[in-house]
Amino acid sequence: RNKQIKSGEVKQEALWRDAWRELKKPIVIYYMLVFSGFWFLFNALFDVLPIHISEWVDTSVIVTSLFGSEGTSNGILQFWLGLNNEGTKVMPEGMLNLNAGLIMTCCFIVAALTAKYRITTAMFVGCLLSILAFVFIGAFHAAWFIVLAIAMFSIGEMMISPKKNEFMGNIAPEGKKAMYLGFVMLPQGIGWGLEGYFGPKLYEIYASKELFSRDLLLERGMNSTEVSAIPQGEAFTTLVSYTGESAQELTQLLYHSHNIGMAWYIIAAIGTISAVGIFIYGKWLLTLQRAQQAA
């Protein structure tokens, strides 16, 4: 292409004009739209799930299963498993470390298994796995189910994330692969921007332990002035001391008296729209390629 520009065969224009022309192509527009939903899911995992685990998931069950009821005092295990200082429960960041650990150890296996499939097929299946993971998070709050959900999402991510670069490289016109690889980041930016606003809002509406605790304090007889005076983040501990009930009992009460999973089902629904879009996009692209080959 550089030789063609120098010889005058191809006229070079401003990069932004060239990029804008490519961005307006249906193949790029549809790509950005259908894959933004997956990146909404991806960001929700790291943005909202840690709060969900902290508020609703008893991760001490995992430690008890592995080391007994007293946990472990081994500093190395505490560090690598992301346990608290007492070694009795897994911290939210420790749970999410499973995602990074699986990607580091299993990405080449997933890549080998998906290599024989069309790129859009692999990404479609990966998106379905990610959606199922969020349904699991919404349906169950048992610690081991959350571990399973994170593992499922990680496999889905491994099927999508590396393939997106390969896909964009394949559909890029000659001499514009670098530009198209830059376009890969656009759906991520759209998904991140939308999730950054709507993800926490959904959680606040359907699953906020803080708000539910304040409501229960009012129901149990605390006046509204006292409830309003409770510092942000301390409503549940106030509820425990006010009622005299255990934190575990109150957590179960709040969980079962509210539809906590709805936030995750809505996020999964967004992913479902994305998965359907990926499927249709893949079929459309295949038809387009066959038409070009026939011509």
What residue spans do the PLM features occupy?
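Intracellular juxtamembrane helix-capping segments at the cytosolic ends
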Residues: M158-P173
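Helix-to-loop junctions at the C-terminal end of transmembrane segments
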Residues: T105-I119
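Hydrophobic core of transmembrane alpha-helices in multi-pass small-molecule transporters
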Residues: A133, W144-I160
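A late C-terminal transmembrane helix in Major Facilitator Superfamily
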Residues: G175-A207
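A membrane-interface helix-boundary motif in multi-pass transporters
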Residues: K201-T272
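Loop-to-transmembrane helix entry
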Residues: D58-M104, A111, N259-Y265
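Intracellular loop-helix junctions on the cytosolic face of multi-pass helical membrane proteins
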Residues: R1-F46, P50-S60, A263, A269-A295
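C-terminal ends and interior cores of transmembrane alpha-helices
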Residues: A111, L128-H141
